[in-house]
UniProtKB/Swiss-Prot annotation:
Keywords: Ribonucleoprotein, Ribosomal protein. This is Large ribosomal subunit protein bL33. Pfam families: Ribosomal_L33. One of its GO terms (molecular function) is structural constituent of ribosome. It comes from Dehalococcoides mccartyi (strain ATCC BAA-2100 / JCM 16839 / KCTC 5957 / BAV1).
Amino acid sequence: MAKKTDTRIVINMACTDCGERNYTTEKNKRNDPRRIELSKYCPRCREAKVHRETK
């Protein structure tokens, strides 16, 4: 079986405009050492906005 290592961590994605945390995802710390920024739909703003990784 594959080993469970600590390379993947669970992160929250927050909207940069309203600050609401809408999405939860995983990232690999080795491949993405910096904070992730993705364009996602924000239900509060009712449009696609940039979401940034929060701790």
